[in-house]
Amino acid sequence: MAKRDYYEVLGVERGSSDAELKKAYRRLAMKHHPDRNPGDKASEDMFKEANEAYEVLSDSSKRAAYDQYGHAGVDPSMGGGGGGFGGQNFSDIFGDVFSDFFGGGRGGSRGGAQRGSDLRYTLELNLEEAVRGTTVNIRVPTLVNCKPCDGSGAKKGSSPVTCPTCGGIGQVRMQQGFFSVQQTCPRCHGQGKIISDPCDSCHGEGRVEEYKTLSVKVPAGVDTGDRIRLSGEGEAGTQGGPTGDLYVVINVREHAIFQRDGKHLFCEVPISFVDAALGGELEIPTLDGRVKLKIPEGTQTGKQFRIRGKGVAPVRGGGAGDLMCRVAVETPVNLSRRQRELLEELRGSLDDDNSHSPKTTGWFEGVKRFFGDL
């Protein structure tokens, strides 16, 4: 099944900014996260698809490659390079094509030391941890150099030998009709060396699977989609090649009270209709503790109050955002007889004066005009 276009997956245009990409990814990640959709295979697939798309498009080099070559530019099975895939670079992809047809002298580019693959780890945080910063220990599966053979793949006391088929180049040249075609050596599989006496621990691979426990320092202000790079904590390279990197991708869980949009926080504050009518003072929760909010008389549902500086300080610097509190006026329920009597008395007193409910009065006048025009 063909992969969908990464921009289509995130629902953005090709020229979208990094901020737009991040916002689109955050929306999809929140919507389809497995914690919010347990047992929903479709949502799980969409979550993985969004992760894959954002991993490519949020990296400038990968995005440039994807924009130019499409999925082939970032697909490891097609030779795509870049973090997280550990594949070849693009000169390898297209250089090999011309080498195959015209016998170009690129043999050996695949053999020898190769850099280890980059790894990706999704780190779940609550909102408080993301806003204040934290240090978290994570356990990551990876490939490390085999200690008994020191990464050579050969049993201790022996060494890999030059492949006699390709002479250590890693590729062989074959004649196909009028063309001289260069192909990966079938004996050493492009490594240029063979192991006649493989290590018992790694079976000649030179690397073994292992879990690493790492301490990750998360800076204050991170948000869903942000990445922390741990240099040299990816998979070990082969034949002495450098180790890849580990990218820790942040995913902030949904909060019970606050919603976040960039550096601003939003919450809904329920108030009684009495406080809405007469005004009052409420204690509002913030991430730094409680603050008092004055409610003016005549406050309506939907009225939004701004508490400055009680949002989030962005990870890349700048002042903290604001906390936006939206009022929701509650209608009382389960009234006692006395309470009903008081409300009936209040309703009777209000019916004589339309100035108490200007919106209601205006709405009914509009209805009358509407039917009068029919």
Swiss-Prot record:
CXXCXGXG motif repeats lie at residues 146-153, 163-170, 185-192, 199-206. Belongs to the DnaJ family. The gene is dnaJ. Binds 2 Zn(2+) ions per monomer. The lineage of its organism: Bacteria, Pseudomonadati, Pseudomonadota, Gammaproteobacteria, Pseudomonadales. PROSITE patterns: DNAJ_1 (PS00636), DNAJ_2 (PS50076), ZF_CR (PS51188). It is found in: Cytoplasm. GO terms for biological process: chaperone cofactor-dependent protein refolding; DNA replication; protein refolding; response to heat. Keywords: Chaperone, Cytoplasm, DNA replication, Metal-binding, Repeat, Stress response, Zinc, Zinc-finger. GO terms for molecular function: ATP binding; heat shock protein binding; unfolded protein binding; zinc ion binding. It holds the Pfam family DnaJ. A zinc finger (CR-type) spans 133-211. The keyword Cytoplasm applies. InterPro entries: DnaJ, DnaJ_C, DnaJ_domain, DnaJ_domain_CS, HSP40/DnaJ_pept-bd, HSP_DnaJ_Cys-rich_dom, HSP_DnaJ_Cys-rich_dom_sf, J_dom_sf. Residues 5-70 form the J domain. This is Chaperone protein DnaJ. Participates actively in the response to hyperosmotic and heat shock by preventing the aggregation of stress-denatured proteins and by disaggregating proteins, also in an autonomous, DnaK-independent fashion. Unfolded proteins bind initially to DnaJ; upon interaction with the DnaJ-bound protein, DnaK hydrolyzes its bound ATP, resulting in the formation of a stable complex. GrpE releases ADP from DnaK; ATP binding to DnaK triggers the release of the substrate protein, thus completing the reaction cycle. The J domain is necessary and sufficient to stimulate DnaK ATPase activity. Zinc center 1 plays an important role in the autonomous, DnaK-independent chaperone activity of DnaJ. Zinc center 2 is essential for interaction with DnaK and for DnaJ activity. Zn(2+) 1 binds at residues 146, 149, 199, 202. Homodimer. Its cofactor is Zn(2+). One of its GO terms (cellular component) is cytoplasm. The keyword Cytoplasm applies. Signal peptide: none annotated. Zn(2+) 2 binds at residues 163, 166, 185, 188.
